[in-house]
């Protein structure tokens, strides 16, 4: 079975849903508290099947908001993302995807990848691949030859 994980930042409302008393606190206070929380597993994803393989994975919270990821010191944020990726590794993931702002901090995941023993992807390759596929399909629909278009 293939195993994966996806790391994503949180929003203040995520904490307020988990701890309803926090709804009455200013966002800045909640963000201050979030900085001291360790990365944690949000959910375990099962039942991913195709005719060729089966997979399971984990959705892991990097307990910083997108705003914190761009305003806190880069080394601190990178450390929190590495912590989340190490949790993915400990859970058994063989690849981890960096979601949202986790993929743009620093050097687009290169430092992250050097600090864990599993594959790390930012999704950029997937974005490029789908753009190329869309371009090929558009050229085909227009009745053109890509080599001469």
Question: What function would you assign to each model-found segment?
Answer:
Residues 118-137:
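A glycine-rich, Thr/Ser-enriched phosphate-binding loop motif common to dinucleotide/cofactor-binding enzymes
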Residues 137-149:
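Glycine-rich phosphate/diphosphate-binding loop of Rossmann-like nucleotide-binding domains
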Residues 1-113:
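N-terminal ligand-binding/catalytic initiation module
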Residues 111-117, 139:
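Short, surface-exposed basic-aromatic patches at helix termini and helix-loop junctions that form
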């Amino acid at each position: 079975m293939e195993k994966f994980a996806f790391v994503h930042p949180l929003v203040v409302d995520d904490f307020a849903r988990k701890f309803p008393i926090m709804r009455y606190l200013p966002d800045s206070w909640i963000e201050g508290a979030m900085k001291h929380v360790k990365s944690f597993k949000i959910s375990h994803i099962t039942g991913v099947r195709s005719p060729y393989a089966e997979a399971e994975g984990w959705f892991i919270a990097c307990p910083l908001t997108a705003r914190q990821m761009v305003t806190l010191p880069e080394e601190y944020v990178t450390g929190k993302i590495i912590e989340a990726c190490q949790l993915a590794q400990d859970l058994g993931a063989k690849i981890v995807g960096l979601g949202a702002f986790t993929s743009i901090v620093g050097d687009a995941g290169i430092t992250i990848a050097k600090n864990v023993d599993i594959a790390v992807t930012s999704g950029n390759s997937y974005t490029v691949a789908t753009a190329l596929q869309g371009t090929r399909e558009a050229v085909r629909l227009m009745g053109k030859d890509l080599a001469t278009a």
